[in-house]
Amino acid sequence: MAKTSMKAREAKRAKLVAKFASKRTELKAIIVDMNASEEARWDAVLQLQQLPRDSSPSRQRNRCNITGRPHGFLRKFGLSRIKVREHAMKGEIPGLKKASW
């Protein structure tokens, strides 16, 4: 199990990403726009740098919804490989069965 503080930190990052997503996309659009003036583009870069560091989506880490484990995460289920296996063996994941050939 991951520490509670790590889970809380990830939750905080998720909130910040959601809060600043629109602002971040607007600023990035200005930065990429070649028709915008150099001054406007530079101002957009500076404003983007002023946003909180944790508001960047690349700072988020995929974690298991049950244990908080950061490695062996399966996006399709939102769980770590260990918990996916446990739930699959109990038959709690619809349509998932153990392979045999």
Curated annotation (Swiss-Prot):
Coiled coil: none annotated. One of its GO terms (biological process) is translation. It comes from the Bacteria. One of its GO terms (cellular component) is small ribosomal subunit. The keyword Ribosomal protein applies. GO terms for molecular function: rRNA binding; structural constituent of ribosome. Keywords: Ribonucleoprotein, Ribosomal protein, RNA-binding, rRNA-binding. Pfam families: Ribosomal_S14. Belongs to the universal ribosomal protein uS14 family. Part of the 30S ribosomal subunit. Contacts proteins S3 and S10. HAMAP family: Ribosomal_uS14_1. Binds 16S rRNA, required for the assembly of 30S particles and may also be responsible for determining the conformation of the 16S rRNA at the A site. This is Small ribosomal subunit protein uS14. It comes from Aeromonas hydrophila subsp. hydrophila (strain ATCC 7966 / DSM 30187 / BCRC 13018 / CCUG 14551 / JCM 1027 / KCTC 2358 / NCIMB 9240 / NCTC 8049).
